[in-house]
């Protein structure tokens, strides 16, 4: 941490003995030890906080990447849904257009003149004279077995 070797410590000890003397040296050593422990604890806490912030930063980055992936997937699904809806609308328009453009067959009927016999009618009439169907009697359907 401080890169202090054994020779440097020995030099500090000799200088401390010369400056402080043998009576005040133990008290100064305790004072220096307390400050050393406080400094070491502070540095350790600072390192832990930095590591925690880095982990949180990495976690936030991973969360943002996942959110970006989810948003991209959501956009893709929305595009597919829009395409399907457009396709359904175009198909329904095609169906209505083909229904409008498809011509119904024209039934051309020409009256037949003369007398004819229609089965299940009670009287003989001419087609040109027959305009109302209410003149016919009810028809019974018989199935041959």
Curated annotation (Swiss-Prot):
Keyword DNA damage part of the UniProt annotation:
no
**What is the originating organism of this protein?**
Acinetobacter baumannii (strain ATCC 17978 / DSM 105126 / CIP 53.77 / LMG 1025 / NCDC KC755 / 5377)
Q: Which cysteines are joined by disulfide bonds?
A: none
| Protein name in UniProt | Sec-independent protein translocase protein TatB
Q: Tell me where it mainly resides.
A: membrane
The UniProt GO MF terms for this protein read: protein transmembrane transporter activity
Keyword vocabulary terms for this entry: Cell inner membrane, Cell membrane, Membrane, Protein transport, Translocation, Transmembrane, Transmembrane helix, Transport
How does the UniProt record describe the way this protein sits in the membrane?
Single-pass membrane protein
GO biological process terms, alphabetically, are: protein transport by the Tat complex
One Pfam match: TatA_B_E
Protein task: Part of the twin-arginine translocation (Tat) system that transports large folded proteins containing a characteristic twin-arginine motif in their signal peptide across membranes. Together with TatC, TatB is part of a receptor directly interacting with Tat signal peptides. TatB may form an oligomeric binding site that transiently accommodates folded Tat precursor proteins before their translocation.
| NCBIfam families reported for this sequence | tatB
Q: How does it assemble?
A: The Tat system comprises two distinct complexes: a TatABC complex, containing multiple copies of TatA, TatB and TatC subunits, and a separate TatA complex, containing only TatA subunits. Substrates initially bind to the TatABC complex, which probably triggers association of the separate TatA complex to form the active translocon.
* Gene (UniProt): tatB
- Member of which family? Belongs to the TatB family.
